[in-house]
């Protein structure tokens, strides 16, 4: 049985005695972003209804205790459970309550099963006429544009006011988000039109009389609630808060008038008719006091999440035939970097490459929108062999720009002893010229439309990880696989390609030391000391080394573990993509300073829902009669194509040496 969801507005009230209650509208007759309409009058339910956290059925946080169908929707009252015993349940309940109270979670969503529905003319949406209500959830980002928390209040505020105790602060969350501008206008009393400007003393008297009137109105509101034995409802609370704010403004204004009265008494001067008219105009201009408050969203996201959210906005815009930039503004209001990155994806403005003809070489790498792309690249780098160079004490590869000639000396000249009057011999120096051209590595990651539309943070993580995984495997395999040869204009050769491997001598600790000595000897024979040497090996090989023990039961190679470490004083990088065959694995020693790396630091992203794909990591090119294609449109899938410009090359042949058939530690 399919469970549907609909979203609506929520008003939260907090009790000082820890009795957590939420009131709000669980369903409205307005269409959501999916263009569906859920008719409140068609609801079938039985109280109490489970109240869940983010639609997770294994994370209940309370019950719906009251539900009333009205013209505006289904008005609900929700009781959040509270426990005293420490544990995961208490942590979840406290987190849910604090998230709702602080405004981080601002929407309600109903889970239901459709019994009767019809197509809405001129729309892809459905109108659910009869439906069975299963659960209600608090959600972070609702699909309905109206589904936001309107206010967060404490009922204890009214209880304290009734007892004459100073009230606690009120936290308000604006419907547009944390970064929206909220303007509160308080009108102060002024003389009636047609009357002459009153003196300062008359103004003070009038304001004091107005204050008494408003204080009496506040007292009447509280008296009425006390006689009925009830707390203030939403309308009474708003009226009470407004009166309280106006009295505070009047008190400040009276204080200013009294200060002005003292100054006038000390500096009394004749006032002309023109000056009086000007003063009247100035006072009228100050009748309204406006205060604007803007809070900028400074939430620190996990690496790569900002880029994933920009990609999701691009996909949602395509799926729903809406402006992707507008979706980014509505979902992530205040997060300017995500909005700017979405705009960059929509306009297909590629991240500029570094070239020698560009006077502002580093300019394209600065800015909010490009920082999102760089953030994703920085998330991807530590997951690749290439990206681990230059981090955590590991030497860096030699970074070079694209299309710039690299001149290297391959052999030196000779000097000669020359006798008196004899001809001086000539000598010859050998040089080579290399240029790294930008080559593109690309792959396609596929996600379901349900994941794209999911508003939970975990959905953003799924998109980010799929985009990263699309590039990580190819980069690692082609960088280290000895069999990978260069394809002109397409891909670079592996740094081990064309270098003869050294067969491993055995499995024991002594054999390991002999193998290591053989690798070092290869560098010594070429007069190229591996001062920036780095070991590359599979994680299983590193694990086998860490498990080897000497006769005393101590670790034979204590500096290494399955995640890396050091071996004979040099750092170790492990990867699951380093070649491993039945005969054994490959272990390489790489002199990092002898490897050229060109990396512009950018990534290009495109998406489609109509393409047909070969769900294969080695697609036919061109396709044949036996090629099986999968339609993204037919299966509700979204394809993301990610591309990076990158290239590498050995500086010299002696930059690397490697072992083959390694089975260290095997029985």
Swiss-Prot record:
One Gene Ontology term from the biological process aspect of the record: viral procapsid maturation
Keyword Cytoplasm assigned: no
Class of enzymatic activity (EC top level): hydrolase
Record InterPro entries: Peptidase_S78_dom, Phage_capsid, Phage_capsid-like_C
EC number in record: 3.4.-.-
Transmembrane segments: none
Any Pfam family matching the protein: Phage_capsid
Stretches of the chain forming a coiled coil according to its record: none
Annotated site, Cleavage, chain positions: 348-349
UniProt keywords, alphabetically: Autocatalytic cleavage, Capsid protein, Hydrolase, Protease, T=7 icosahedral capsid protein, Viral capsid assembly, Viral capsid maturation, Viral release from host cell, Virion
Positions of region (Prohead protease activity): 8-154
Keyword Manganese annotated: no
Post-translational modification: The prohead protease may be autocatalytically cleaved giving rise to the mature capsid protein.
Entry's Gene Ontology molecular function annotations: peptidase activity
Any single GO CC term annotated in Swiss-Prot or TrEMBL for this entry: T=7 icosahedral viral capsid
Protein name according to UniProt: Capsid polyprotein
